[in-house]
Amino acid sequence: MNTIPLTLDAYKPTYTVLGGGRGSGCRDGFPVSVLLLNRGPMLYRAEMIQELVRVGFESIVSMELIGDSPELEGLASRYPQVRFICLHEAANLGVRVNIGMRESCSPFVFVLWNDQRLATSTLSSRFFDKVVDLDAACLVPTLNDATGSPVPSISHPAQSGKAFRVVPLPPKADGEKSLYPFDACGIYSREKFMLLGGFDWTIGNPYWQKLDFGMRAWLWGETIRYAQALRLNYDGAPPAEDTTPDADYGRFWFKNLA
């Protein structure tokens, strides 16, 4: 069983940074910064950023799509808290998260997507104290679809004969363990993420990429836990997980189960 994680520095695609200044928005009193991932239409980009700033986040890294709109320069001037990362080449989910973690400055990084909304307009200082106290590699949120129904986002390992299976269920109890962060969403300990080697950029399928990270965290004695107070709502349907046993599954299997 291969438990040696890749380092985040093993692959560094080129990119341009617009706005902000590395570490300029972080201060000791607010331990969480934001990593905003983007997909699909960008109709409400400005509103999303404004909402995050209004909640109180002082440092936001936005991972942009290739060939993104010219409005970025205007947004960068309006929101000095935001640094826009413009990749020069296509990159899978893990690569984008790895870059965002390197570019973030806080000890904890809240990863979410542009098609999600915070279900609360404020996050209390008590909640951030809990983030520190739980000492988890990642705290995953309650996820609801556009109708308000809970997404089965908590993953549990199961065994069927000699086969390894993952069973997704809706969250039940605060602090409940999950095998991996659904849709890569959650509040990550930046230090633990770095020590674990981040996401394996050689695994292109996001499902096996996230599962590989979760298995590695477990093998290294770290935990991924559900935080009931953290809630996100999807604007539309949540993304479907592609669990096809493809070549990426083969790499995951050899690294974690062989």
Regions found by a protein language model. Name each.
Residues 1-50:
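N-proximal low-complexity "stem/linker" segments adjacent to membrane-targeting elements
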Residues 157-179:
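Short, flexible, basic/aromatic active-site loop/helix in glycosyltransferases
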Residues 180-188, 192-197, 203-230:
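A short, conserved alpha-helix in the catalytic core of glycosyltransferases
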Residues 117, 121-155:
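Conserved donor NDP-sugar-binding/catalytic core segment of glycosyltransferases
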Residues 87-104:
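Glycine-rich, basic loop-to-helix element that forms the pyrophosphate-binding segment
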Residues 50-59:
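Short, acidic, metal-binding catalytic loop of nucleotide-sugar glycosyltransferases
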Residues 219-258:
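Active-site-adjacent helix/loop segment of glycosyltransferases
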Residues 107-117:
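Short beta-strand-to-loop acidic/aromatic patch adjacent to the donor-nucleotide binding site
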